[in-house]
Regions:
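Catalytic PLP-binding core of fold-type I/II PLP enzymes
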Residues: 1-13
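Short, ordered loop/turn segments at secondary-structure junctions
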Residues: 4-6, 49, 69, 150-152
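Active-site PLP attachment segment
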Residues: 19-54
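Short beta-strand
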Residues: 31, 65-66, 110-115
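A short glycine-threonine-serine/GTX helix/turn-capping micro-motif
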Residues: 41-42, 59-68
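Conserved PLP-binding catalytic core of the aspartate aminotransferase-like
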Residues: 86-101, 105-141, 150-157, 164-166, ...
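A common structural junction motif
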Residues: 139-144, 180-188
Length: 203
């Protein structure tokens, strides 16, 4: 199970989607990332010792690979402790997630069928629109989000991925919803077709 979006956000002890569904003990190989709920880099695989041993000696990416720097390992351990000992973080996170996702939906934005804090916003456009749009968001609204384009998604589709956290506020949510309403309006008007639109807007 690749549970990049579930670990640290779902389950009674934030153990992920399997824990949330009550099937964690039935998972043979469990993948997770430190790049989302842990706010770090790297990832992990959890499995029986025999499987881990096989992967260590047979996975090409492991050949000549180095361990994560110790500060990052210690940081991951500390975050894991906080996830287990501070249940209020989960409650705050999901309050923000539900507010953001419902706000975006009420504003007419398409979020698909997300069930995790990672919030995709589906828009229509090509590379030019996507480039101008994300620069506009970053430079003029102060909002950073990753963008997914073809060939990961069909041509003409743009996905912007927002990752709300437990330290965001309702003011952040309201600001983000307003910003996305505005960029959706600009996109529908064809304003992002203009070359260097987003950069020029802030000058």
């Amino acid at each position: 199970v690749d549970d990049a979006h579930g670990v640290g956000t779902m389950g009674p002890r934030l153990g992920g989607t399997g824990q949330e569904q009550g099937v964690q003990d039935d998972i043979d190989v469990y993948f997770g990332t430190f790049a989302k709920s842990f706010a770090l880099i790297g990832g992990f695989i959890a499995a029986d010792p025999e499987i881990i041993g096989f992967l260590k000696y047979n996975t090409r990416s492991q050949i000549f690979a180095k361990s994560l720097p110790m500060p990052l390992v210690l940081g991951a351990q500390k975050r894991l402790e906080m996830m287990r000992d501070r249940p209020e973080f989960k409650e705050k996170l999901w309050t923000i997630v539900h507010a953001l996702q419902s706000g975006l939906k009420n504003a007419g934005l398409d979020l698909g069928n997300t069930n995790s804090p990672v919030t995709p916003v589906y828009l229509k456009g090509g590379p030019a629109e996507a480039s101008n749009l994300v620069v506009d968001l970053r430079e003029n609204y102060g909002i950073f989000c990753s963008v997914v384009m073809y060939p990961v998604v069909p041509k003409g589709v743009i996905i912007l991925r927002l990752i709300p956290t437990a330290v965001h506020t309702m003011e952040d949510v309201n600001y983000t919803v307003k910003a996305f309403s505005e960029i959706q309006s600009k996109l529908s008007q064809g304003l992002y077709d203009r070359e260097n639109y987003a950069v020029g807007l802030g000058s």
